[in-house]
């Protein structure tokens, strides 16, 4: 499979995006398709958000330091230092419960992007966006091992980044829900994710090392990240519907 350069990509590939999203909706665990959609539709997004980052004092300092977050987020000794109740401790628990890892996302992204390790500001910003995805799961309360949780965070991310690929995935998931029993609850939860992303502070300018020391609930308040109430309601409705189904017995 040919790799794609995020630096050279300037046009959107709608055909490729439709193929990838069809595969993704059939198998929400196929993370490779997410990166294909981003490569197809997010042309110029990293450059635009990098310019926004360096336009702020704190963002300029982060860009100047150019820390590779994957090296921090895969360092067990570094993660072990954070006290219970902090963002860092919550992220550590997230990794333990899900079995996910930052270097797992890194490996998948390198299957698609030829320049993910390139020493270029836009490529660095793209890597940073990749590496903070699971941190945003922790901050927002949208579960990563749940298809609806991913869709809600994707909608949140679209509001934060304006990356068309994120919006395309969220919209596709919402349209698919029209054929599902709990479809209305799913669509409301996705809309809530987008609304929360718009209302929250711009998270890209957060210093992750400082954020990880902060108590999780205090960080949510400071960043104006509201509780995912409609998402929780949709989860409960799905669980209730599942438990009310008659059990099938073997013939």
Where are these regions (language model features)?
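Proline-rich intrinsically disordered, low-complexity coils
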Residues: 28, 57, 147, 227-228, ...
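C-terminal structured domains
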Residues: 185-251
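Leu/Val/Ala/Ile-rich N-terminal alpha-helices, chiefly Sec-type signal peptides and the beginnings
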Residues: 2-46
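Core of folded catalytic or high-affinity ligand/protein-binding domains
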Residues: 35-213
């Amino acid at each position: 499979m040919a790799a794609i350069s995020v630096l050279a990509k300037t046009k959107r590939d709608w055909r490729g995006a439709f193929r990838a999203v069809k595969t993704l909706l059939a198998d929400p665990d196929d993370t490779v398709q997410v990166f294909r959609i981003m490569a197809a539709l997010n042309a110029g997004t990293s450059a635009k958000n990098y310019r926004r980052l360096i336009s702020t004092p704190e963002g300029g300092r982060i860009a100047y330091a150019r820390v590779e977050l994957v090296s921090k987020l895969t360092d067990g000794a570094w993660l072990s230092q954070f006290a219970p109740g902090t963002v860092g401790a919550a992220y550590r628990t997230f990794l333990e419960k899900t079995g996910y890892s930052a270097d797992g996302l890194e490996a998948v992204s390198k299957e698609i992007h030829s320049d993910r390790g390139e020493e270029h500001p836009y490529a660095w910003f793209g890597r940073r966006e990749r590496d903070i995805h699971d941190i945003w799961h922790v901050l927002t309360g949208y579960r990563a091992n749940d298809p609806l949780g991913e869709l809600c965070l994707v909608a949140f991310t679209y509001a934060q980044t304006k990356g068309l690929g994120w919006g395309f995935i969220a919209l596709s998931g919402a349209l698919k829900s029209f054929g599902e029993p709990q479809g209305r609850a799913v669509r409301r939860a996705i809309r809530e994710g987008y609304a929360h992303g718009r209302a929250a502070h711009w998270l890209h300018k957060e210093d992750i090392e400082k954020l990880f020391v902060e108590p999780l609930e205090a960080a949510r308040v400071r960043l104006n990240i509201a509780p995912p109430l409609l998402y929780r309601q949709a989860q409960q409705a799905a669980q209730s519907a599942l438990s009310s189904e008659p059990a099938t017995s073997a013939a």
